[in-house]
Amino acid sequence: AIDFLRRVNLGETPDIGPAAAVIGGGNAAMDAARTAVRLGAKVTVVYRRSRDEMPADDEEIREAMAEGVAFRFLAAPAGITGQGRAEELRVELMELDARKKPVGTGRFETIPVSAVISAVGQKIDLGGMQDIATGSGGRVTGPERRPDAHRATSQRCGWSRRRTSP
Protein backbone atom coordinates (compact mmCIF):
# COMPACT_ATOMS: atom_id res chain seq x y z
CA ALA A 1 0.00 0.00 0.00
CA ILE A 2 2.83 2.39 0.78
CA ASP A 3 4.25 2.13 -2.76
CA PHE A 4 0.76 2.60 -4.26
CA LEU A 5 0.15 5.68 -2.10
CA ARG A 6 3.62 7.08 -2.86
CA ARG A 7 3.02 6.72 -6.62
CA VAL A 8 -0.31 8.55 -6.39
CA ASN A 9 1.23 11.29 -4.23
CA LEU A 10 3.93 11.75 -6.87
CA GLY A 11 1.23 12.44 -9.46
CA GLU A 12 1.02 9.03 -11.11
CA THR A 13 -2.32 7.39 -11.88
CA PRO A 14 -1.82 3.66 -11.40
CA ASP A 15 -4.08 1.51 -13.58
CA ILE A 16 -6.02 -0.46 -10.99
CA GLY A 17 -9.05 -1.07 -13.16
CA PRO A 18 -12.69 -1.01 -12.05
CA ALA A 19 -12.51 -3.13 -8.87
CA ALA A 20 -9.80 -3.31 -6.23
CA ALA A 21 -9.35 -5.32 -3.06
CA VAL A 22 -7.23 -3.89 -0.26
CA ILE A 23 -5.88 -6.50 2.14
CA GLY A 24 -5.44 -5.28 5.72
CA GLY A 25 -7.16 -3.38 8.48
CA GLY A 26 -4.86 -0.54 9.47
CA ASN A 27 -4.68 3.13 8.56
CA ALA A 28 -2.53 2.40 5.49
CA ALA A 29 -5.30 0.09 4.24
CA MET A 30 -7.90 2.82 4.76
CA ASP A 31 -5.72 5.36 2.92
CA ALA A 32 -5.14 2.95 0.03
CA ALA A 33 -8.85 2.09 -0.18
CA ARG A 34 -9.96 5.72 -0.23
CA THR A 35 -7.30 6.58 -2.80
CA ALA A 36 -8.42 3.70 -5.04
CA VAL A 37 -12.03 4.93 -4.80
CA ARG A 38 -10.87 8.37 -5.91
CA LEU A 39 -9.18 6.71 -8.91
CA GLY A 40 -12.60 5.35 -9.90
CA ALA A 41 -12.48 1.80 -8.54
CA LYS A 42 -15.12 -0.05 -6.58
CA VAL A 43 -13.12 -1.06 -3.49
CA THR A 44 -13.46 -3.86 -0.96
CA VAL A 45 -11.26 -3.99 2.14
CA VAL A 46 -10.60 -7.61 3.13
CA TYR A 47 -9.71 -8.16 6.79
CA ARG A 48 -9.25 -11.50 8.56
CA ARG A 49 -10.71 -10.36 11.87
CA SER A 50 -13.91 -8.56 12.83
CA ARG A 51 -14.54 -4.80 12.74
CA ASP A 52 -13.86 -4.61 16.49
CA GLU A 53 -10.31 -5.92 16.03
CA MET A 54 -9.34 -3.52 13.22
CA PRO A 55 -6.29 -1.44 14.17
CA ALA A 56 -7.32 1.51 11.96
CA ASP A 57 -8.60 4.63 13.68
CA ASP A 58 -12.41 4.72 13.91
CA GLU A 59 -12.43 8.03 12.05
CA GLU A 60 -10.46 6.51 9.16
CA ILE A 61 -12.91 3.60 8.93
CA ARG A 62 -15.96 5.88 9.02
CA GLU A 63 -14.48 8.11 6.30
CA ALA A 64 -13.71 5.09 4.11
CA MET A 65 -17.29 3.85 4.52
CA ALA A 66 -18.63 7.33 3.72
CA GLU A 67 -16.61 7.29 0.47
CA GLY A 68 -18.18 3.98 -0.55
CA VAL A 69 -15.54 1.47 0.49
CA ALA A 70 -17.06 -1.97 1.15
CA PHE A 71 -15.69 -4.22 3.89
CA ARG A 72 -15.41 -8.01 4.00
CA PHE A 73 -14.59 -8.98 7.57
CA LEU A 74 -13.52 -12.42 8.76
CA ALA A 75 -11.97 -13.25 5.38
CA ALA A 76 -8.34 -14.16 4.67
CA PRO A 77 -6.74 -14.08 1.20
CA ALA A 78 -6.25 -17.59 -0.19
CA GLY A 79 -5.32 -16.88 -3.83
CA ILE A 80 -5.54 -14.60 -6.83
CA THR A 81 -6.58 -15.77 -10.28
CA GLY A 82 -6.39 -14.03 -13.64
CA GLN A 83 -4.70 -13.87 -17.02
CA GLY A 84 -2.05 -11.13 -16.96
CA ARG A 85 -4.06 -9.18 -14.39
CA ALA A 86 -5.98 -10.05 -11.24
CA GLU A 87 -9.55 -11.16 -11.96
CA GLU A 88 -10.64 -12.79 -8.71
CA LEU A 89 -9.48 -12.81 -5.12
CA ARG A 90 -10.26 -16.07 -3.36
CA VAL A 91 -10.76 -15.68 0.40
CA GLU A 92 -11.24 -18.20 3.17
CA LEU A 93 -14.00 -17.32 5.60
CA MET A 94 -12.78 -17.08 9.18
CA GLU A 95 -14.21 -17.42 12.67
CA LEU A 96 -12.79 -15.96 15.86
CA ASP A 97 -11.94 -18.48 18.56
CA ALA A 98 -12.36 -17.81 22.29
CA ARG A 99 -9.13 -15.75 22.30
CA LYS A 100 -10.27 -13.67 19.29
CA LYS A 101 -7.76 -15.43 17.02
CA PRO A 102 -9.02 -15.92 13.43
CA VAL A 103 -9.42 -19.57 12.47
CA GLY A 104 -10.16 -20.81 8.95
CA THR A 105 -13.53 -22.46 8.37
CA GLY A 106 -12.65 -24.32 5.17
CA ARG A 107 -15.32 -22.29 3.32
CA PHE A 108 -14.27 -19.98 0.50
CA GLU A 109 -15.67 -17.07 -1.53
CA THR A 110 -14.39 -15.19 -4.55
CA ILE A 111 -14.38 -11.43 -4.97
CA PRO A 112 -14.16 -10.02 -8.53
CA VAL A 113 -11.14 -7.69 -8.73
CA SER A 114 -8.88 -6.01 -11.25
CA ALA A 115 -6.21 -5.15 -8.65
CA VAL A 116 -5.14 -6.33 -5.21
CA ILE A 117 -3.31 -3.92 -2.90
CA SER A 118 -1.53 -5.39 0.12
CA ALA A 119 -1.60 -3.22 3.24
CA VAL A 120 -0.35 -5.78 5.74
CA GLY A 121 2.72 -5.12 7.89
CA GLN A 122 3.51 -1.77 6.31
CA LYS A 123 6.73 -0.05 7.39
CA ILE A 124 7.82 3.39 6.29
CA ASP A 125 11.36 4.38 5.37
CA LEU A 126 12.45 6.84 8.05
CA GLY A 127 15.36 7.97 5.83
CA GLY A 128 17.31 10.42 8.01
CA MET A 129 14.88 10.33 10.92
CA GLN A 130 16.29 7.29 12.73
CA ASP A 131 16.77 9.31 15.95
CA ILE A 132 13.06 10.03 16.35
CA ALA A 133 11.66 7.98 19.23
CA THR A 134 8.76 5.70 18.40
CA GLY A 135 6.58 3.47 20.53
CA SER A 136 4.34 0.53 19.78
CA GLY A 137 3.12 0.40 16.21
CA GLY A 138 5.85 2.85 15.11
CA ARG A 139 4.01 5.90 16.43
CA VAL A 140 6.08 8.94 17.35
CA THR A 141 6.41 9.35 21.13
CA GLY A 142 7.23 12.38 23.22
CA PRO A 143 6.25 14.48 26.22
CA GLU A 144 2.61 14.56 27.24
CA ARG A 145 1.78 18.19 26.48
CA ARG A 146 -0.26 20.11 23.99
CA PRO A 147 1.11 22.57 21.44
CA ASP A 148 0.86 26.21 22.34
CA ALA A 149 0.16 29.15 20.03
CA HIS A 150 3.83 29.37 19.01
CA ARG A 151 4.47 25.66 18.47
CA ALA A 152 1.41 24.42 16.60
CA THR A 153 1.56 20.81 15.51
CA SER A 154 -0.79 18.12 14.31
CA GLN A 155 -2.57 16.53 17.24
CA ARG A 156 -2.37 13.14 15.49
CA CYS A 157 1.38 13.39 14.99
CA GLY A 158 2.17 14.50 18.53
CA TRP A 159 5.56 15.66 19.70
CA SER A 160 8.78 14.10 18.53
CA ARG A 161 12.03 13.94 20.44
CA ARG A 162 15.45 12.46 19.85
CA ARG A 163 16.06 8.98 21.13
CA THR A 164 18.46 8.84 24.04
CA SER A 165 21.63 6.86 23.47
CA PRO A 166 21.63 3.35 24.97
Show where each model-derived region lies:
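Short FAD-binding loop at a beta-strand-to-alpha-helix junction that anchors the flavin cofactor
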Residues: 20-22, 143-166
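Gly/Ala-rich phosphate-binding loop of Rossmann-like dinucleotide-binding domains
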Residues: 33, 37
